[in-house]
From Swiss-Prot:
Keywords: Ribonucleoprotein, Ribosomal protein, RNA-binding, rRNA-binding
Organism, as annotated: Alkalilimnicola ehrlichii (strain ATCC BAA-1101 / DSM 17681 / MLHE-1)
Any GO MF annotation of the entry: rRNA binding
Full protein name: Large ribosomal subunit protein uL24
RNA-binding found in the keyword field: yes
PANTHER family: MITOCHONDRIAL RIBOSOMAL PROTEIN L24
One Pfam family from the record: ribosomal_L24
InterPro entries: KOW, Rib_uL2_dom2, Ribosomal_uL24, Ribosomal_uL24_CS, Ribosomal_uL24_KOW, Translation_prot_SH3-like_sf
GO cellular component, one term: ribonucleoprotein complex
Amino acid sequence: MRKIRQGDDVVIIAGKDKGRRGRVIRVYPDQEKLLVENVNVVKRHRKGNPQQGEAGGIIEQEKPIHQSNVALYNPATEKGDRVGIRVLEDGSKARYFKSNNELVDG
């Protein structure tokens, strides 16, 4: 079970975007990276291709960030928080915040 999943709200805890919040767009488990919206935005210079109708120019896009630089956002404390995994009575696994022991998904 992954501690951070697609659709989670996260806080950046290290790097040039430290302190910013965003939603996870995509998870790359083999690289241990996450794509977070409006975080780690870079500018790419693209050459136009008139044969295919593509315009050139400067394009901004998000790049993946390593999952160690991200913490799950806890709405109760309004901060980034560490996450653990616990087995419930029915045998299923659930994620919980380590600061206040509340379940992440309910």
